[in-house]
Amino acid sequence: MLQSTLAGEPCQNKHDRKSGAHPSSSFYIGRGPSIERSTTSTVRKREAIIFGATGAVGSELLRLCLDGSRYSRVTVIARRPTSMTHEKLQWVPAEFNALEDLATISGLVDGDAYCCLGTTIKAAGSEEAFRRVDYHYVLNAARFAKQSGVTQFSLVTAIGANRDSGILYNRTKGEIEAAIIAMDFPSLNIFRPSLLKGKRAEFRLKEEIGNWLFLLMTPLFHFGLQRYKPVEISKLARALYVSADPEHKTISPRIFESEEIQAY
């Protein structure tokens, strides 16, 4: 059954067959646009759901959603609460392998869902555990969002996402992209950042090494390697938030490559 706590803290085209995988029957440039637009009493405020709000990207995105005027309510679905408190914040404790237990709030969301779930093989402990989070849990989140009436879904994957890749990480990211594209959300944004740069609750050695290597390679970014430059976590969160503004919509699905995210 649904349990919610207000003010707790806790979260390329559709025909591009190379961008991701087939749906599974299993259940988981310059400066960017201005971050907020004025609202009037005639504009109905939207609602938001965030999956993964306790992670580095999700927590930064949550702050933007709460501080901005776009949303009247922000629902975080997570196993544990975040450290933030706000009158618009609603925390719904849940396990991502059992989101069907939350079916009681279906149809109550008039707005957007953001999915910032993700891990690494090392952090997950095995390839199977990694895939459970990055594919099945993400797919569960998207299904739940769809059933809840969400009209716009924003998904974070990674640079190099490709369902035909021989690398498990890239292949899994590509497969989940394709599965969610097939769900046919009215509006879908997919973000493919390079390595993420910023403060994390957990230490990721490979990302830290990668960030140092890219720092040494900075001069090469002017020679075609810009897309591999590490992305600030704050920029990714801003890109997620700004792109969800209805006034900024263009095509769907819209894929934001890493160099585009750098512009925010």
Can you name each region flagged by the protein language model?
Residues A48-I49, R73, L89-N140, F144-Q147:
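NAD(P)H-binding glycine-rich loop region in Rossmannoid oxidoreductase-like domains
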